[in-house]
Amino acid sequence: MDFGAMMFSTDYSIRPDDLAKMLEDRGFESMWVPEHTHIPASRTSPWPGGPDLPKDYWHTYDPFVALTAAAGATKDIKLGTGICLMIERDPIVTAKEIASLDMLSGGRFIFGIGGGWNAEEMEDHGTNFKRRWRVLRENILAMKEIWTKDEPEFHGEYVNFDKMWAYPKPVQRPHPPILMGGDGPTTFDRVVEYCDGWMPIGGRGSGGVSLAEKIVLLKRQAEEAGRDPDSLNITSFGLRPDPDLIGRMREAGVDRVIFTLPSEERAAVTPLIDECAKLIS
């Protein structure tokens, strides 16, 4: 099982390049950053994590800028978005950013995506909350065309372009792995159709179904759709450094666990990184 760490990389926390180097030196397999372009001051959408939204959400760096800085300071650690809000992004521009990052990092990018929760933030980008999953699907399918074709074209309801030339292509073939966040009733449909793995938060099940049972259901659905179930990566996101919890994740069939780090300066975050690192071996 692989181990990674996630932080809201902000203008007041440890720099992303310094964090990546610390993680790589301690044997972590991957580093992850989330995304929010902004938080509307008039937000009414409830944050799933509780009543008070942490300021990290509106101080975080652009994920691709942060990960590019991390790539330049490291050699081997993988670099992921957890998650990238493709519902708020231009697919042509983002396909270019990801291909560039994958090229410059030597093929180390992992593309974590999701539907998000902040309706007001999405609407500022022109995306209707109720249509976000359809927008996400077309964005991802269009980006795959750009990454894998010499003259890609795409004609959908939300994304539409004629044949184009768009380089570089990603180092990873056919493209960087795409992991779907979330745990809704149709999440597995999305994973099986256009993703390479599943990234649930917290390692918990839902609806009375355990994580281990969920993984069995996902792999069964993948096999029924003609996909190799063992090709799907299961990444459990946002965990604490608890040996018993990590053991349960391993038994459930999780391939990677991601620890959550607070958005703090180096001195404050180093002890927690060291605590997490003890579980890697």
List where the protein language model places each region.
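Active-site-adjacent structural elements that line small-molecule/cofactor binding pockets in enzymes
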Residues: 1-281
